[in-house]
Regions:
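Glycine/small-residue-rich loop that forms an oxyanion/phosphate-binding "nest" at active or ligand-binding sites
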Residues: 31-79, 85
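Active-site mouth loops of central-metabolism enzymes
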Residues: 1, 45-54, 109-127, 170, ...
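Hydrophobic faces of well-ordered beta-strands that scaffold small-molecule active sites
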Residues: 8-10, 46-50, 70-72, 105-111, ...
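Glycine-rich, proline-tolerant flexible connector loops at the mouths of alpha/beta enzymes
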Residues: 7-30, 76-82, 138-152, 196-200
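Alpha-helix-loop-beta-strand connector modules within alpha/beta enzyme cores
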Residues: 19-48, 88-109, 152-175
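Catalytic cores of alpha/beta
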Residues: 53-66, 129, 160-166, 170-191
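Conserved anion-binding
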Residues: 63-140
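C-terminal helical cap(s) of enzyme catalytic domains, especially alpha/beta-barrels
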Residues: 84-92, 157, 161, 188-200
Length: 200
């Protein structure tokens, strides 16, 4: 807060090797406790992502801890990640969110996410993927570079912004030197690597 940030996202970044799609109750419990304390201490907008692709669990954590959004990978269209095949989760996720009464928890969906192969969807553009997130009732799209710490291409951000009316957040590689390059196309910046030392 003192540094001028508007929000925080909690993520089990170093819980490697990541499980695919589902995590154990100990991860859910830990993320809920951490998230609740971060929200209480900061008073900021707080989101959560549970790797890898544990989107249902992330929504449950956000709901239980009073957080504002869950970041979801594999929301629209499938892809191959480090962990294997990641299916689209939008249908299950939105129904689960409604079932537990968590409608106030926003879903921020990665499009053509980092650390993944998108060969199976090469005929679908980044803009079309963003359109699909909007069609599937996502609340925001997250655009990244190809890996953690690498920024997205400016033209990719512009394409996404031109194809949907959702909040466009940038999810990797943003720092003090390149942040201005992405105005006015980006609405939010998730800054992690730039603030860390040796990855922590």
């Amino acid at each position: 807060r003192a540094g001028g940030g508007d929000g925080i996202i909690d993520e089990n970044m170093h819980d490697v090797a990541y499980l695919r799609g589902r995590v154990g109750p100990e991860v859910v419990a830990a993320m809920a406790v951490i998230g609740r304390e971060v929200k209480r201490e900061s008073g900021l907008v707080v989101g959560v992502q549970i790797l890898a692709g544990a989107n249902v669990e992330a929504v449950a954590v956000a709901h239980a801890a009073g957080l504002d959004f869950a970041r979801a990978e594999g929301y629209a269209f499938a892809h191959i990640a480090d962990e294997g095949w990641i299916e689209s989760s939008a249908a299950e996720l939105l129904r689960y969110r409604r079932q537990i009464g968590a409608g106030r928890v926003q879903v921020w969906a990665d499009v053509k996410k980092k650390h993944s192969s998108h060969a199976v969807t090469t005929d679908i553009s980044l803009g079309e993927t963003a359109e699909a997130v909007e069609f599937m009732r996502g609340d925001a799209v997250v655009v990244t570079g190809s890996v953690t710490g690498r920024p997205p291409r400016v033209e990719d951000v512009r394409e996404v912004k031109a194809h949907c009316r959702l909040t466009v957040a940038l999810g990797s590689g943003i720092d003090a030197d390149n942040l201005a390059d992405f105005y006015p196309d980006a609405d939010a910046f998730i800054i992690g690597s730039h603030l860390k030392k040796d990855g922590h």
